[in-house]
């Protein structure tokens, strides 16, 4: 028996089941696909696929449906992804080009991804720890108060206010010098790599001005240390309701898992590691978790397709985005959509 032919039979079963939601029988395969073999041979191939755990027979039907293992083989053997149409690409570009700031970009992206995939879309905000500093601005306010503004390459803006004793407020020349030195050592560098340079800055200033420099350094370090920076946005939850027949028991565990941001953040973090392996094997950096590959019990009947975005290289993502839906998913189209949106989002943030 040909392993390649058996794979073609599995591909046909996956495509038909995704398209029709109906278990697939040998007669349907003969009628819909030019497999070039007899119905008896197809039945034998289906029996072998079932014995190997790639397809299964639901209790109520004589047809077969793909298992998580079957979907995994189907995804792993995808050689190409269907590209988006020129009209779809133009629509994505136009939508993101109109965004006015980072929040608007992220909001437009998550809604767009949900719309074109008909799944739940999730977009992680760019992590401050993985972004590059574009510029630091120091803005004197009231006496003894200074606003520190950090602008990242992703468009993210972090602001912190420093309170100083009125008699310890620096003069304009000191503020200007610190601003210049901060940008000289920091602009164009990843935020976590500023540590040594920041520690050296006070040595360039008079002892009387060093408490001020230390205070600025402290708020920059504080911004990096904050755990609250990791957050996500989500859209398209209603799409799950349209797929409720794909969840044999109940959709409630999925909805409950989606309500827990920590679950989704952990999942995206795990998929970031998956993407490193996928990038070396398939070259596209698209990570796919299928069914029970998801460690959270509430997501055991779902699949997640994710990709990194931002950064100057494929392995330099500043955050991740993805979609979640039933395992009965159009994987090639969904993977292509996630890849395309991630690329356009990267360009939009790169400005």
Curated annotation (Swiss-Prot):
Pfam families: HrcA, HTH_DeoR. GO terms for biological process: negative regulation of DNA-templated transcription. Gene3D superfamilies: 3.30.450.40, Heat-inducible transcription repressor hrca homolog, domain 3, Winged helix-like DNA-binding domain superfamily/Winged helix DNA-binding domain. Keywords: Repressor, Stress response, Transcription, Transcription regulation. InterPro entries: DeoR_HTH, GAF-like_dom_sf, HrcA, HrcA_C, WH-like_DNA-bd_sf, WH_DNA-bd_sf, WHTH_transcript_rep_HrcA_IDD. One of its GO terms (molecular function) is DNA binding. Belongs to the HrcA family. Negative regulator of class I heat shock genes (grpE-dnaK-dnaJ and groELS operons). Prevents heat-shock induction of these operons. This is Heat-inducible transcription repressor HrcA.
């Amino acid at each position: 028996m040909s392993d390649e032919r058996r794979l073609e039979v599995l591909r046909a079963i996956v495509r038909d089941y995704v398209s029709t939601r109906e278990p697939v029988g040998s007669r349907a395969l003969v009628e819909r696909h030019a497999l070039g073999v007899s119905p008896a041979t197809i039945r034998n191939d289906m029996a072998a696929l079932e014995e190997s755990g790639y397809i299964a027979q639901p209790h109520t039907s004589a047809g077969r449906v793909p298992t998580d293992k079957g979907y995994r083989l189907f995804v792993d053997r995808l050689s190409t992804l269907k590209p988006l149409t020129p009209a779809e690409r133009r629509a994505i570009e136009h939508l993101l080009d109109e965004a006015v700031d980072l929040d608007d970009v992220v909001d437009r992206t998550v809604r767009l991804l949900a719309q074109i995939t008909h799944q739940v879309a999730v977009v992680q905000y760019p992590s401050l720890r993985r972004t590059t500093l574009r510029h630091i601005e120091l803005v004197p306010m009231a006496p003894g108060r200074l606003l520190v503004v950090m602008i990242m390459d992703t468009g993210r803006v972090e602001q912190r206010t420093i309170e100083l004793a009125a008699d310890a407020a620096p003069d304009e020349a000191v503020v200007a010098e610190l601003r210049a030195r901060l940008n000289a050592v920091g602009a164009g560098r990843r935020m976590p790599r500023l540590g040594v340079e920041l520690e050296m800055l006070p040595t360039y200033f008079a002892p009387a001005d060093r408490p001020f420099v230390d205070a600025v350094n402290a708020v920059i370090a504080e911004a990096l240390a904050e755990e609250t920076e990791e957050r996500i946005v989500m859209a398209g939850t209603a799409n799950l309701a349209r797929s409720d027949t794909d969840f044999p028991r109940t959709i409630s565990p999925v909805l409950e898992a989606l309500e827990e941001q920590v679950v989704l953040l952990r999942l995206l973090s795990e998929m970031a590691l998956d993407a490193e392996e996928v990038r070396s094997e398939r070259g596209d950096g698209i990570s796919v978790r299928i069914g029970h590959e998801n460690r959270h019990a509430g997501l055991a009947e779902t699949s997640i397709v994710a990709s990194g975005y931002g950064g100057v290289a494929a392995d330099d993502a500043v955050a991740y985005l993805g979609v979640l839906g039933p395992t009965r998913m159009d994987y090639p189209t969904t993977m292509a959509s996630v890849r395309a949106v991630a690329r356009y989002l990267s360009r939009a943030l790169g400005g």
